[in-house]
Amino acid sequence: RINTIIYIIPFAFLFCYNIVFSQTPSISKKEFYFMKGNIGGSAITMYLYIKGNRITGKYYYDSIKQFIDINGNINGDTFYINEFVNNNKIASLNGKVTENMFFSGDWISSDLNNKHYFNFSRYSSSSISKATIINSSLKIDLEGSGKFDSSRDAVVIENQIKSKVLDKISVDVDGVKSLDENGIADILSKEIIADYNNWKNNLSLETDINVKREIKISYLDDKIISFAINNYSFVGGVHGIDTSVAYIYSISTGNRIGIKLSELISNPSDMDLINLIRNKLLINYSEKDFFDFNAIELSDTFDITPTGIKFIYPVYKIAGYSLGIIEIEFTFSELKPFIKSNSPFFYLFE
């Protein structure tokens, strides 16, 4: 009997320890850099993310302004990056990187027929050239009783100049009332643990939950910064729901802008504009794909891109779930006739 007790107690302790340990969210950080440089003498603008030794992001030639996706690895002072257009690899960049984030090396086309020298570095002239995206996540499988999967991002803008405006943006964009990275991680983790405990206590109602919030910088210049916030929520039922919204801020005031369509468009009911959006929808879809094609108007959710304005239709807004989130982009020249002259975005169309 004594031996049995001796063996049971350590086993029970280990079991309880594993349960507690498994309920501790993991924390990770990803650094965002706003970069400028050139490839073969052609100016580029780059949104670069570094997480550990992993590089992701996108860039565009300033003369073309069409995003090119990138991913690769950094190892000490060397790096290798592949670039893609529509998921097709078109070139690679490899070379050296210094401690102050100056990248240089050779750009080589996939067919090996073209080779150019490149360099890019942090755009120090910008008020915002670096931000940290902090993530807290927790995944638990109760083995037959349900699965819990939650992940949340928050962002803090590097603020060496102690600008109240930049701090205002950092606090507002994710709703986390802290500027300290450890404090932010703690807040995110407490929110996730609270959700977990609520889920665990209601397993009879829902067996699985999957909730995610991802934040990316979708556009940045000297006047505005836009964050794309993508959410996914599954709390039972047939399927989960994706949402995408842009949080756009004035860098001079820290105020959020672009909340209403009236801040951008002079007359959202203009039939020329409405017909234009419907024609764009028909490029990839047919009229029967929508609930009521002739009732479709301009979405009041939009984001900025290097080439124009992207309008975002949430799931179920104009079509069924299978079509997902629908995004339609206008070039600046296409949309210019419909822009308010006093819009905070008017400078983009000049």
Positions of the model-derived regions?
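Edge beta-strand at a domain terminus
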Residues: 23-29, 62-78, 106-137, 242-251
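Short aromatic loop motif centered on NTY/YTY
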Residues: 92-94, 261-328, 336-350
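Acidic/His-rich structured neighborhood in mature extracellular/periplasmic domains
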Residues: 198-255, 259-264
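Central antiparallel beta-sheet cores of small beta-barrel/beta-sandwich binding domains
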Residues: 24-99, 104-107
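Active-site acidic/histidine clusters and adjacent loop/turn architecture
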Residues: 123-223, 313-318, 325-328, 332-350
